[in-house]
């Protein structure tokens, strides 16, 4: 028996050291497919109570010792740092290093961390693990490593480019989001990170995803720059049927903005990580959906075939729109998903969840396919996610786009020039764009508008806006039942062509 075990180990070593050996997503997919055929085993917490019961301020005290960054003794521009377990990050994840010839487990050591004022028994932490990791790269300055990627919790990851700060998150997979049965949160249980060469400008990460009803193999190629791009390939296997599968999910926060002003006096005009969902539909239409913080859970679906892209965007970068010196919402990136290949029929879905403060992510967007295979069958998805502050990259170059949506009390100007509220709600939508700016001011621009059964458009008008060299649409809307949401759409056009993307808005229920 011992001889056979030694022989098996020798065979494995030969495979790993063979010059033809190379780790790939297929190696992870074999594990994912095998897991899908077995019953789900929930991860078990190994945390002592002092770490399990700690508050966020205590968890923040546990800092990685930057002088011990992984690969710090190599010439590669990428470095790794790790997150310690604590709070709800209570189960360890395995992290491996992949080289040209081997796969090696990166072992946890408490020596990696400075625990601050957190009192703990050193013997109780020696057998703990990592909760996740972060990637550092000299993205802003050649002589300084800055954090560009964080993978921590469930299948969440955050990414930034040059001059950006963390904002919205991406996820590996979403299951049954906003369904009455409750959402299932898959988690990355193991990672494999390729050791980069000194000249490499991209980093490859593999991940094994697991949850009660799905498993998956993921390959992330991270390409840092002015815009950081993550190339994603996934192979997903269902253990059991799901109500809804969310592919390429994005998670963000919207508290208030001009389309939904703060109910309390606030020196910040806007407070959000993203202010709209942008969609490039399979038929070529561009759609802009401003975000809400509703009083009740709200879901908006956009059915289409073979989407060309979608994303949660932060449109408008002037500091005066946010006035927040601490959180710098003006520097938070937009995230744009570009599918590779044909994704078939399905929906881009937007979920908006009520929140009272900015600490809760209350916005989710994802692609959900109409048809799902039987459990055990492989699903393949390939796409890129671009994290950018470049407005011009995130809308059609020849289309006008919505610069701002403002909501106001509807009114009518009286003969004495005093404005009198008339029981309507007014929406003021500014459109601009490179081609639109070339149009003469007297161009006969009109609005194509529509509203759902719960509302009536009392008046709509379009006028030239010299401040932005664009056009302003003003609509006064009368809502029939305030307990129900009201859907609206609008676009600008001339007699012979459409000039703008489609403004699509849901006025939330008010009760």
From Swiss-Prot:
Annotated metabolic or biological route of this protein: Glycan metabolism; osmoregulated periplasmic glucan (OPG) biosynthesis
Keywords: Periplasm, Signal
GO annotation terms (biological process): beta-glucan biosynthetic process
Main location, first listed in the record: periplasm
GO cellular component assignments: outer membrane-bounded periplasmic space
Record has S-adenosyl-L-methionine as a keyword: no
Disulfide bonds: none
Localisation per UniProt entry: Periplasm
A GO MF term: catalytic activity
Listed InterPro entries: Gal_mutarotase_sf_dom (IPR011013), GH-type_carb-bd (IPR014718), Glucan_biosyn_MdoG/MdoD (IPR014438), Glucan_biosyn_MdoG_C (IPR007444), Ig-like_fold (IPR013783), Ig_E-set (IPR014756), MdoG_OpgG (IPR023704)
Pfam family, one: MdoG
Extent of the signal sequence: 1-22
Family: Belongs to the OpgD/OpgG family.
Function: Involved in the biosynthesis of osmoregulated periplasmic glucans (OPGs).
Protein name: Glucans biosynthesis protein G
Organism of provenance: Escherichia fergusonii (strain ATCC 35469 / DSM 13698 / CCUG 18766 / IAM 14443 / JCM 21226 / LMG 7866 / NBRC 102419 / NCTC 12128 / CDC 0568-73)
Lineage, top ranks: Bacteria, Pseudomonadati, Pseudomonadota, Gammaproteobacteria, Enterobacterales
């Amino acid at each position: 028996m011992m001889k056979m075990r030694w022989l098996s180990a020798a065979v494995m070593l030969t495979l790993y050291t063979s010059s033809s050996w190379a780790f790939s997503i297929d190696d992870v997919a074999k594990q994912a497919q095998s897991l899908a055929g077995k019953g789900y085993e929930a991860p078990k917490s190994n945390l002592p109570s002092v770490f399990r019961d700690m508050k966020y301020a205590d968890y923040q005290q546990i800092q990685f010792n930057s002088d011990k960054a992984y690969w710090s003794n190599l010439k590669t521009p990428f470095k790794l740092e790790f997150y310690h377990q604590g709070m709800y990050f209570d189960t360890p994840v395995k992290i491996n290093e992949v080289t040209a010839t081997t796969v090696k487990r990166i072992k946890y050591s408490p020596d990696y961390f400075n625990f601050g004022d957190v009192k703990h028994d050193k013997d109780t932490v020696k057998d703990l693990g990592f909760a996740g990791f972060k990637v550092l790269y000299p993205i802003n300055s050649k002589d300084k490593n800055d954090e560009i990627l964080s993978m921590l919790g469930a299948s969440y990851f955050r990414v930034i480019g040059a001059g950006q700060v963390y904002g919205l998150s991406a996820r590996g997979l979403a299951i049954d989001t906003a369904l009455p049965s409750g959402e299932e949160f898959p988690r990355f249980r193991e990672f494999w990170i390729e050791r980069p060469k000194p000249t490499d400008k991209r980093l490859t990460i593999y991940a094994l995803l697991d949850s009660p009803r799905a498993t998956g193999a993921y390959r992330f190629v991270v390409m840092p720059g002015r815009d950081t791009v993550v190339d994603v390939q996934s192979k997903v296997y269902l253990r059991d049927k799901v109500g809804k599968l969310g592919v390429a999910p994005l998670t963000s926060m919207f508290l208030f903005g001009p389309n939904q002003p703060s109910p309390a006096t606030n020196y910040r005009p806007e407070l959000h990580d993203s202010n709209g969902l942008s969609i490039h539909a399979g038929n070529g239409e561009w759609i802009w959906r401003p975000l809400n913080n509703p009083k009740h859970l709200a879901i908006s679906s956009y059915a289409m075939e073979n989407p060309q892209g979608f994303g949660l965007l932060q449109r408008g970068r002037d500091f005066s729109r946010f006035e927040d010196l601490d959180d710098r919402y003006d520097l938070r990136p937009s995230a744009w998903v570009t599918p590779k290949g044909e994704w078939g029929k399905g929906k881009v879905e937007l979920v908006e969840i009520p929140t009272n403060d900015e600490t809760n992510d209350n916005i989710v967007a994802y692609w959900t396919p109409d048809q799902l295979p039987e459990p055990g069958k492989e699903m393949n998805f390939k796409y890129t996610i671009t994290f950018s502050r470049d407005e011009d990259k995130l809308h059609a170059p020849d289309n006008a786009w919505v610069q701002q949506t403002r909501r106001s009390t509807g009114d009518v100007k009286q003969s004495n020039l005093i404005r009198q509220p008339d029981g309507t709600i007014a929406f003021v939508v500014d459109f601009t764009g490179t081609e639109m700016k070339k149009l003469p001011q007297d161009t006969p621009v009109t609005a194509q508008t529509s509203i759902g059964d719960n509302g009536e458009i009392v008046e709509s008008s379009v006028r030239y806006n010299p401040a932005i060299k664009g056009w302003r649409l003003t609509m006064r809307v009368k809502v029939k039942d305030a307990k129900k949401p009201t859907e609206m759409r609008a676009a600008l056009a001339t007699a012979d062509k459409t000039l703008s993307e489609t403004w699509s808005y849901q006025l939330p229920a008010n009760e």
